[in-house]
Amino acid sequence: MAAGASLKRIKEASPTPETNHELGFIKKVVFKLHDTYANSTRTIEEPPFEVTETGWGEFEISIRIFFPTEMGEKNILLYHHLKLHPYKKDNIPAQIGAPGGAPNANEDEENTNVPQPVDSYVYDELVFNEPSEQMFELLTSRPGALLPAKSDPNDPSKSYSLQTEAEELDRLTAGLETVYQQVQKTKEYILQLEKEKETLSQ
């Protein structure tokens, strides 16, 4: 998903002949956009199953994937939360922003005047727990998708890599450690209050 300054677009990454071939087992995809769009339900019946639209904001898109009848596979419904706007600096917590928690006003004003693209990528994965025999043969007849070692900022299709996976794990680990430290401090504070309560009750 990508957004520009004057034109906001809802669009999947650019397809290739290889990806078109890999999506050939899909019969059609039905996108349900926000009700404010004319013809908010869009049915796409050929690869690369894209929807391109203009707009600005944040909303949920329902995506229903249909397979050919001979595949014997039920259709799949998934939801994609579209975020197509930048997060302003005043929404950033003080400890993450400029020193003292006050963002630089001149810098904020300067950034407002410079058009900046908004890139929003979300990784979705379909899991077939009990696929039909035809679907199983199709899925196992081709190699799985392997993540590249590093991300390429100029190629949206390579936004996910072993590098970004490791970075995300590091962020999760750091977040868990922060939560653990806060829980410990809270426990110590509660224990201190209980001791003070006992002292006052004597």
UniProtKB/Swiss-Prot annotation:
Entry's Gene Ontology molecular function annotations: histone binding
PROSITE patterns on file: YEATS
Domain called YEATS: residue spans: 1-142
GO cellular component: cytoplasm; NuA4 histone acetyltransferase complex; nucleus; Swr1 complex
Coiled coil (UniProt feature): 161-202
Region of interest: Disordered: 94-113
Localisation: Cytoplasm; Nucleus
Gene Ontology terms: biological process: chromatin remodeling; DNA repair; regulation of transcription by RNA polymerase II
Keyword tags: Activator, Chromatin regulator, Coiled coil, Cytoplasm, DNA damage, DNA repair, Nucleus, Transcription, Transcription regulation
Pfam families reported for this sequence: YEATS
Written domain comment of the UniProt record: The coiled-coil domain is required for assembly into the NuA4 complex.
PANTHER family (UniProt xref): PROTEIN AF-9 HOMOLOG
Functional summary from the UniProt entry: Component of the SWR1 complex which mediates the ATP-dependent exchange of histone H2A for the H2A variant HZT1 leading to transcriptional regulation of selected genes by chromatin remodeling. Component of the NuA4 histone acetyltransferase complex which is involved in transcriptional activation of selected genes principally by acetylation of nucleosomal histones H4 and H2A. The NuA4 complex is also involved in DNA repair. Yaf9 may also be required for viability in conditions in which the structural integrity of the spindle is compromised.
UniProt record similarity statement: Belongs to the YAF9 family.
Subunit structure: Component of the SWR1 chromatin-remodeling complex and of the NuA4 histone acetyltransferase complex.
Protein name as annotated: Protein AF-9 homolog
Organism from which the protein derives: Yarrowia lipolytica (strain CLIB 122 / E 150) (Yeast)
